[in-house]
Amino acid sequence: MKKKNIQTPVLSMAIAACMISHQQNARAGEKPSLQNDSVPYVTMPDVSPKLTTGDGNPLLDFMFTADPTAVEYNGRIYVYATNDQQQYDSIGGYGKNSYEYIKSLVMMSSDDMTNWTYHGIIKTDSIAPWIQTSWAPSIAKREEADGKTHFYLYFSNSGGGTAVLTSTSPIGPWSSPLNHSLVDTNTPGIAGECKAAFDPGVVIDDKGKGWLTVGGGCARIMRLGKDMISVDGPIKPIRAPHHFEANELNYINGTYVYTYNIDWQDFSDWPLQTEKPTTCCMSYMTSKTPLVTKSWKYQHNYMKNPGDYGFDYSNNHTHLHKFRGKWYVFYHTMSLQHSFNTTAGFRNVCVDEIQVDENTVNIHMGNQTLKGVKQIQPMNPFIIQQAETTAATQGVKFTNGKSIGDMYAVTVPNKTGIIAVRGVEFNKVPSSLEIKASGNGIIEVRRDTPDGEVIASIKVGTPQMKLIESQLQKNMTGTMDLCFVLKGNNITFDEWKFK
């Protein structure tokens, strides 16, 4: 039987209430919090759970992430997540993931749902020094009078409040328009009954109005001001049965859809005629008039706990998103931590398809898998592709490039680095490969697997980042996977393109 990693509502609220003392301990030197944008090498899996299996989950196999949200922009889906890796880097695999050292958010994106580009982290504590921690983001975008698309990224400022960052790009730079939380546990309409004002969920409806939900152990909804960084009018309750956390909002066919995490109780007091939900599952409610409390109708649960799908039992958090005509559910499990030889509660973001009937606003029961979703378009090898775009990795970490959201792949000492990409379509025969890299060693390109047929072998011998071109050892066409195998010392890999 799987060991359950269960936090009761009382324990969850206690953790939130203790965040201030945790932060004071950290500042006093009990545990340093890493503040750079790279993924430091602490312990990495000897074998990636994705490299040889063909699995698509988790989205990133080299770091821990959780509590996903997403937004579409220019044909790509951008996913934002809690940076569990920062907690892991601060305490190691033998501590407990109690989230107190997490002061950043993770960014990644994809145009094919298989190869994911890691854009680095948002250092929330540098942008907004007044925050305590940053968890569970939710994002919305809109085009404004200046002709630019503006992004509004809300996140939990510990358990006590919800903060917001803004940008005119999905990868930043980000700024804090306020010097305090947008709402907290002292805000009228939240104060008193709600012990936590966190886990925000945001949506913009078809009239251009923004809406925000928050809460832990209770749920609150508010209309946002025209500036998206203020509250317009009263904050109203949503009477969500057995509410725990993980609020999100969608707007489907003129209906407001509120999703949340059901608690760990036995439901002997379940107040509705509907089927009782499963423990710590995800459920949803609907309304046409969101500020009218009685208008909210509970529907049913649409995703069980990860433990009910064969993973470890854990807290639960999802985001529903329609992309390229398909509905997806983003969620987290704790499957990756076993590759890191830890059971301390570190999470990883995954995605699977889910069926949503938009006419009836019915969300069918979803599934959680290691396999994940199908690739929705092939990768084009004849345009510049970034080394931080991966389907699977092993023995590499990522550090900042020269521009915001640009990363370099760097080999880990005493390990062969591997970067795999999938579904690469050669619709013509290439003659050469150009890479940008530095260091000393060899970058091999192999077909399908890390020990597959060698397509190209490029010698790297330069301390400065440099374009290097090489003829191919093998002619090929068709669709295939590629593995970039990095052998040598201090290889830094930026980009590649076939010609």
Question: What would you call each of these model-derived segments?
Answer:
Residues 1-30:
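Bacterial Sec-dependent N-terminal signal peptides
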Residues 29-457, 461-499:
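Carbohydrate-active catalytic/glycan-binding domains of CAZyme proteins
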